[in-house]
């Protein structure tokens, strides 16, 4: 059976290390680690969130 193209992942805040968001990505289109600037409710500001596997 073929491997799935879309993988599920968590986005972790780079400042407080809390995992705030769950999302998925297409690993063919974005092979590198995903980095998004999202709001962290624990830090109460927008911070960079990096991809972490579930």
Curated annotation (Swiss-Prot):
The keyword DNA repair does not apply. GO terms for molecular function: rRNA binding; structural constituent of ribosome; tRNA binding. The keyword Methyltransferase does not apply. Signal peptide: none annotated. GO terms for cellular component: cytoplasm; ribonucleoprotein complex; ribosome. GO terms for biological process: translation. Coiled coil: none annotated. InterPro entries: Ribosomal_bL33, Ribosomal_bL33_CS, Ribosomal_bL33_sf, Ribosomal_zn-bd. Keywords: Ribonucleoprotein, Ribosomal protein, RNA-binding, rRNA-binding, tRNA-binding. Part of the 50S ribosomal subunit. NCBIfam families: PRK00504.1, PRK00595.1, rpmG_bact. Belongs to the bacterial ribosomal protein bL33 family. Found on the solvent side of the large subunit. Contacts the E site tRNA. This is Large ribosomal subunit protein bL33. It comes from Thermus thermophilus (strain ATCC 27634 / DSM 579 / HB8). The gene is rpmG.
């Amino acid at each position: 059976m073929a491997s799935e193209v879309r993988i599920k992942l968590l986005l972790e805040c780079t400042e407080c290390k809390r995992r705030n968001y769950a999302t998925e990505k297409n690993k063919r289109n974005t092979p590198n680690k995903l980095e998004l600037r999202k709001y962290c409710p624990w830090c109460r500001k927008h911070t960079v969130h990096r991809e972490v596997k579930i």
